[in-house]
Amino acid sequence: MYRFAPSPTGDMHIGNLRAAIFNYICARQKNMDFILRIEDTDKARNIAGKEEEIKEILNLFGISWQHYYIQSENLKFHRQMALKLISEKKAFACFCTEEELEAKKELAKKQGKAYRYDGTCEKLADIDVLECEKPFVIRLKKPTHTMKFTDFIKGELSFEPENIDSFVIMRTDKTPTYNFACAVDDMLENVTCIIRGEDHVSNTPKQEHIRASLGYNKAMTYAHLPIILNEEGVKMSKREAHSSVKWLLESGILPSAIANYLIMLGNKTPCEIFTLEEAIKWFDISKVSKAPARFDLKKLLQINREHIKMIKDDELNKILDLNKDLAQLAKFYTQEASTIKELKEKMRAIFNTKDFGEFETECKILKELLKDIELFENYEDFKNELLSKSDLKGKKFFMPLRIILTGNIHGPELGDLYPYIKNFIHELARI
């Protein structure tokens, strides 16, 4: 069982989407169920509407799930598991205040040591715990042995017990910490493989230790994806616009192109342009590079142009939403436009009222002639017919003709454009 477990705390990051895509692909390859779990236990950071937005984005990318969970609805199970660990003396109540812990951290810092919880409350007698009225957290006792696990991308990883510490699993408000909720949910939902960003590597031994302490012995496999760098080679920040999937979509980049690019990023693929369904046939998670991958917006836009060309004409007409059969004309314009947004602007420029500027007189002459001109099969015949009837020459012919046909003084060669614009010429002459 594979899962994608986002938090509804902001726009979906492309790194999260990449993890969702890879989990979905692997689930399909293994013929396993795919879980979507909304990790909403950090109530202070949750943003209204983001849960639905996550589902909408996944649907746009063709990612479906067989099971849907809300993490906060599992709170009773988290508390039951915490009580089990306390009753078995594997976890303990810790009454240390934030101020006390901070003072110990500062002391360790001055001594040049890494701070580790010193076990102050670990050996408290049961009666002392019962009689103490201070707020408390619950800590899981640190492991006693080296923890090892295999990562499909990073290989063999090991963590020494002193580097894991006796960490908090339940807060003073009786809500679980991220690692505890995540580990318990994965256990209850029978997750068998976790694919996520490498920023979670340090969480893995803690989650393994939680499940082991609860007596869960089913093997879990992992793949931690390398971080995505921005175009300057620095870890991509959530503050950067194109790190947001929502921003990319609103910019007119197709879901299929984004998926194509993210699958290809830091990965060897048999071809450059492909669909998600095609990738399912050959994708290999172990072939993903260990090294961070640099995000290249220009490359993504290039891929987007190719995906626009792949769209069926009737579907592209719906996307453009201009009530005309403009698919072939729009695909021709991918030599200039890289996104659906840019294509819509090109189409509007063609079919909206135009500013003739200094060529107003010439444009009026040409428009009158174009209303009834014969639509020749080739551009040369069309051009020669119009030249002879208009008595215009050079710049005073070609510039106004370009404005009438495209809405711009610059653009593609009119001879190249003609086969795609021909059927609309009579209409354009009447705008």
Curated annotation (Swiss-Prot):
Keywords: Aminoacyl-tRNA synthetase, ATP-binding, Cytoplasm, Ligase, Nucleotide-binding, Protein biosynthesis. It comes from the Bacteria. Its EC number is 6.1.1.17. GO terms for biological process: glutamyl-tRNA aminoacylation. A motif ('KMSKS' region) lies at residues 235-239. ATP binds at residue 238. Its main location: cytoplasm. The keyword Protein biosynthesis applies. Catalyzes the attachment of glutamate to tRNA(Glu) in a two-step reaction: glutamate is first activated by ATP to form Glu-AMP and then transferred to the acceptor end of tRNA(Glu). Monomer. This is Glutamate--tRNA ligase 1.
